[in-house]
Amino acid sequence: DFEKKYFNYPIINTTFIGHPVFHIKKRIKKNNYKYISFLLGSRENEINKLFDYFDKLEQYISSNKINYHIFIPTLPHLVDIIKFRTRNWKTVTFISSEIDLFDKYYDDVFISITCSGTASLEIAKRNIPQVVIYKLNFTTELILRHLVKVKNACLLNIISEKMIIPEVVNSQLTNRNL
């Protein structure tokens, strides 16, 4: 029913056929974890828009000697871009586009900082705590504020019609708030 509400228009007939997130297994909770995952987005413009926030988080982790490594799962065409952007990070960072290895690393993730989108569903399905972030350009945010009826950016918050997953988005996304 969720899809019908948002994607079924009088002149366009739509059918929901499933999503790969349903095949993801919930991870087993444990006492010690090795990673904080950074899900930077699946498009280069998302990475460019959000990278400074991830960079500040890495600086916080390294300067406060927080005992976690960073795991960045990504797509093959983004690996070199991310490696270049993270080249000066002091925190041990593992960047991978090898989907077969993701579950191994996700099993060891303490918390995820997740770009809003399908990734938030994948992290939630794995039972990993997360904070969702996103930033529209200022003009787009102003226009959409009056046109869009949903209050949240995270898909799970939209579906449930309440804040389940913490999110810091748009004008609320500042280094201080994050």
Language model segments and positions:
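Nucleotide-activated sugar donor-binding and catalytic core shared by glycosyltransferases
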Residues: 1-178
